[in-house]
Amino acid sequence: MSLKIKLVLIPLLCGLSLLSNAQTALADVTPQRSLPFMAGEWFQFRIHYGIFNASYATLELTKDSVNGIPVLHAKGYGTTTGLARWFFKVEDHYDTYFDEKKVIPYWFIRDIDEGGYTKNLEINFDHHKNLAHVKNLEKNEKKTYKIADNAQDLMSAFYYLRAYYPDHKLKPNETFSINMFFDYENYVFKMKYLGTEILSTKFGNVRCMKFRPYVQSERVFREQESVTLWITDDGNKIPIRLKADLVFGSIKVDLEKFKNLVAPFKIQFN
């Protein structure tokens, strides 16, 4: 995956794969508690590349149905802005339809245009047979792949992680993981817990949990521990900031706006 794609996907994906010492597997768990999100939730993220505002990304959650099954429909949109748009135009659309109780995806759509590089894919998930049916709309090709239990797509993973956050109190350096299927490949998504931190944001001081999402080895990143993610330590579990060190500079992603949260957004006053 190129740097161009990451400028838009980082706040949605927040990392991929590797290992650590302690590990909590989330792949076979079904949430029994109240979900930390609901239909109507909306986020806007601002992505900075150095001193420039490189792009914006939005996430919106609505109610829908797939084959008569009630689902939540997450719509993601990313675009370059300002000076960055003159050099490199990005228009990315992502949709996922996932079970509103089990938080597993049934249908995923990726329709992107990044400086002339285009891709238009649909993935239908059959979790009973552990299969993903991938349709390339540009090439009119269909392929089927074996997937792991409860495999997530790029978008549903964002909500799955929030819903499946470990019940027990995490210790520093402990990790948890889920299974993912993206484009034509299976991955393992892992995050290491680094502790809590009071983060200064545009909204005020916010108590956050600090994580290290593990990403695939690529030439863009200096090393595999180059990404840091902050998630609000409250009932919403919102990714509020992400930093990624690159070979040439760094990317910073900040939560810019939000609405329709499940729980109060907590600000620290001392």
Language-model-detected regions and their locations in the chain:
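Bacterial N-terminal signal peptides that target proteins for export
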Residues: 1-9
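Hydrophobic h-region of N-terminal signal peptides that target proteins for export
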Residues: 13-20
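Acidic, serine/threonine-rich low-complexity disordered tracts
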Residues: 24-127, 166-270
